[in-house]
Amino acid sequence: MNPKKLVIASRESLLAMWQAKHIQGRLKALYPDCEVEILGMTTRGDQILDKTLSKVGGKGLFVKELEQALYDGRADLAVHSIKDVPMDLPEGFALAAIGERANPFDAFVSNQYTRLEEMPEGAVVGTSSLRREAQLRARYPHLLIKPLRGNVQTRLSKLDNGEYDAIILAAAGLQRLKLDGRIRMILSESDSLPAAGQGALGIEIAAHREDLYEVLKPLNHGVTNACVTAERALARALGGSCQVPLAAYCTEENGLLTLRGLVGHPDGSVVLRADAQAPAEYADALGRAVAKKLADDGARELIGAVLNTEN
């Protein structure tokens, strides 16, 4: 099938527009006669910058307006960072494709220090995520962790203005915006296990648009899809959202998936880890199996305590 016109819904931040233009380019290469437009939109998540995501409704704030555009036909597809997509999509929507993953790890950015280990007692580190906060507090209890919101450029400006001694950002976002030069170090899995889906782009459509599944199929990357499926299954099984310090990272080798999961308390006092392996065709079951291991170690009680504290 060769579509005549496709409209991509996207947030208007530089990073979101880079992602939309990347998919636009892929679609134009696949379907040279197709007109591919981008519909830029401002979401609630972009507007509320004075509170952490965990306090204002979570990651769904970044996708609701885009889903409305899919629902009412103004757009055919929406491009998201998968880590910003809620684990359960609203009824009537589906992820039609998951693109090949870029760098899944977190980046340490600082004008004063080259490594986290160098930072002295009381140094201020900015992060937008409870997941990062829990892991940083556990490994570096002498550091002061403070909330950081805004787009990539806003966060870098806050660092440059001296509000923070260092900040932690997703490496993929910096690399996509050609800001690699700001990265002092890529954080290891032991320092900061990534969020479910980190580094991967997802393409969402209205579920009834049967015509689009085949059109978007060439954009799907099988290995990334399997890994992200496992990660999201783990997070879904534990009620994962940005209100919970939860990490999930899956790798693949010769058809075998290895999934590592983590749940922590934001103060770093408790960090639970679990892992398991399974063939790629059992990605969803693998996610649920690692979630059960974490639950058996007390993850549900820990998550309940965190949510009670947040609320």
Swiss-Prot record:
Similarity comment: family membership: Belongs to the HMBS family.
Q: Which InterPro entries match?
A: HemC, Porphobilin_deaminase_cofac_BS, Porphobilin_deaminase_N, Porphobilinogen_deaminase_C, Porphobilinogen_deaminase_C_sf
Q: Which organism is it from?
A: Neisseria meningitidis serogroup B (strain ATCC BAA-335 / MC58)
* Superkingdom of the organism of origin: Bacteria
The cofactor named in the record is:
dipyrromethane
Instruction: Recite the UniProt cofactor note for this protein.
Output: Binds 1 dipyrromethane group covalently.
State the GO CC annotations: cytoplasm
GO molecular function: any one?
A: hydroxymethylbilane synthase activity
Q: How does it assemble?
A: Monomer.
The free-text function statement in the UniProt record for this protein reads:
Tetrapolymerization of the monopyrrole PBG into the hydroxymethylbilane pre-uroporphyrinogen in several discrete steps.
Question: Catalysed reaction per UniProt?
Answer: 4 porphobilinogen + H2O = hydroxymethylbilane + 4 NH4(+)
One Pfam family from the record:
Porphobil_deamC
Please list the residues that carry the modification S-(dipyrrolylmethanemethyl)cysteine. C242
Tell me what else is known.
Answer: The porphobilinogen subunits are added to the dipyrromethane group.
Keyword annotations: Porphyrin biosynthesis, Transferase
Q: In which pathway does it act?
A: Porphyrin-containing compound metabolism; protoporphyrin-IX biosynthesis; coproporphyrinogen-III from 5-aminolevulinate: step 2/4
Q: Which NCBIfam families match?
A: hemC
**Entry EC number(s):** 2.5.1.61
Q: GO:BP terms for this protein?
A: heme biosynthetic process; protoporphyrinogen IX biosynthetic process
Which PANTHER family does the annotation name?
PORPHOBILINOGEN DEAMINASE (PTHR11557:SF0)
Protein name in the entry = Porphobilinogen deaminase
Q: Would the keyword Lyase turn up in this protein's UniProt record?
A: no
